[in-house]
Amino acid sequence: MAVAPLNKFLTIAVPVAPGEQTVYTAPTGSSAIVLYAQVSNVGIGETYPTVTFTHRRKSTSQRTNGNTRNNRIIKGAEIPPNDSLIIIDGRLVLERTAVAIDSIVIEGTQSGIVAISTCQYTDTTGITTVTTSVPHNFNAGDEVTMSGLAFTCASGNYGITTTIFPSPQQSFTIDSIIGSVGTSKTFVTNAGISSGIPHTYVSGGLVGPLQMEFICSILENSTT
């Protein structure tokens, strides 16, 4: 007896954080169709960020396991102030088979990105104090995105699958800065409570003003 496919519509809406982000991977036992994808310039003032949108296929076959092929749908497309770029308005099929895994990846380039030198995170309150290598030029109330901060966590079976925290697929509001605008290298935000799991900063990380937001609509087709 044939199994009727189960269809599910998804909407993914995330900020475009510094660096590369995998925003969606086709789940096991299904294929997916990207129906629509758009990036908007939500920056304050005259900003001209660019975005690259990639269809990534990773091999899982025995002979070529781990090989990756990047098919760039668009590369380095500039988005003017208060405007948006429609990347897909039709369909892009993503597969998950015994020999391949498909993902969609975005990478933004923008002004105002600075490197993070230290970060202190309190798991019980979510309060996060970030120090940058050079003055960050942020004000209290600004929205920022962060990516690539590596942490270690206390031992225990918490179901943690990554050492990167916080998630790059959300933005954060700056609660306060330490020092004066233009010379301050430290700001305070809230990255959310982590259910009593202590985090210790190791290295890395980038932070920048929120300038782009990505949204896409996906239809998943499952037979499992």
Q: What is each residue range found by the language model?
A:
Residues 40-43, 95-96, 175-177:
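Short linear motifs in intrinsically disordered
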Residues 44-70, 110-123:
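Short beta-strand/loop turn elements enriched in aromatics
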Residues 110-214, 221-224:
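Small/polar beta-strand repeat architecture
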